[in-house]
Amino acid sequence: MAASRDFLGGFGGEVGGAAVAGEKGGGESDEIELSLGLSLGGCFGADLAREFKKPRLVRSSSIASICSLPGGGGGGAGGDDVATAAPAPAPLMRTSSLPTETEEERWRRREMQSLKRLEAKRKRLERRNSMNSGRSAGAGGGGRDDGQDAMYPTGFQLRRSVVSQGSTSSCMPEQGVGVGAEAMDTSSSDNASCQNKPLPPTASSGGGGGGRPPANGSMKEQPPLRTLRSLTMRTTSTGDLRKSMMEDMPMVSSRVDGPNGRKIDGFLYKYRKREEVRIVCVCHGNFLTPAEFVKHAGGGDVTNPLRHIVVNPSRSVFL
């Protein structure tokens, strides 16, 4: 190793001689490091004393209040003058993500929403209470009025009707279906007589008076209004209701002789003026015309289907 160093030093001249002198003064610490500093625990050949002797960078301070003062005047009054001459740093203002006005508006909006919800809830409660009070008043006035059986279809009538097709009429149709022309004339006259009947006046919300006041402002005494109970005294029993219903919609039947003939039962459904006669088939519940009713019984296309339909005046088992 010494021969190789002398050989390299001969090419370097004085530099080589100085290097050789330095190597002799350093001793064994300047040996060539062959580990390349690739160990996991650190560099084995690093000289810690040499690393500490290297000049280090002065760390700059990030705090504004700490500042380096020029070292020129030593101590005493000169140092005090420099300290007083340095301006004090301005305090940093903390920024806010939301301004105060926006926060107040948000709270105000929440209060308005809560008030609106309370108002809507109060209205719902008032509406529900008014409906309950109206029902209780109707129940306390006399219970279920018997007049409702005549004005509106009862459960008995709904159960007897096979399907809810077609339109009902407030007037009574013909009593039976004998001949086509006579049946239509009878139903037309009955409808006209029912339409000419005046409707009962309804009670006004104010109380006693139901009509409009005269021009001079004096109120005339009105006759007592007829109640639903007085109008429906004739239909107080279930037997009368069944009888009137059977008169409104009598039972009919059609019998056709032949291999395909059979007997079909049905009932004549209510119909209005200038409307076609409808018969409800009991077996299927379909609304059929007289021709379709006869054809349903197996009679085929006939010229006058009303002649093949028989009205049953006796009480039917379906009612």
Curated annotation (Swiss-Prot):
* Any Pfam family hit: EAR
User: For bias kind Basic and acidic residues, which ranges apply?
Assistant: 105-118
Keywords in alphabetical order, please: Nucleus
Q: Which domain of life is it from?
A: Eukaryota
Q: Where is this region: Disordered?
A: 1-26, 69-152, 181-234
In this chain, composition skew of type Low complexity spans 225-234
Name the residue ranges with Polar residues bias: 185-196
Q: What is this protein called?
A: Ninja-family protein Os07g0602900
Instruction: State the organism of origin.
Output: Oryza sativa subsp. japonica (Rice)
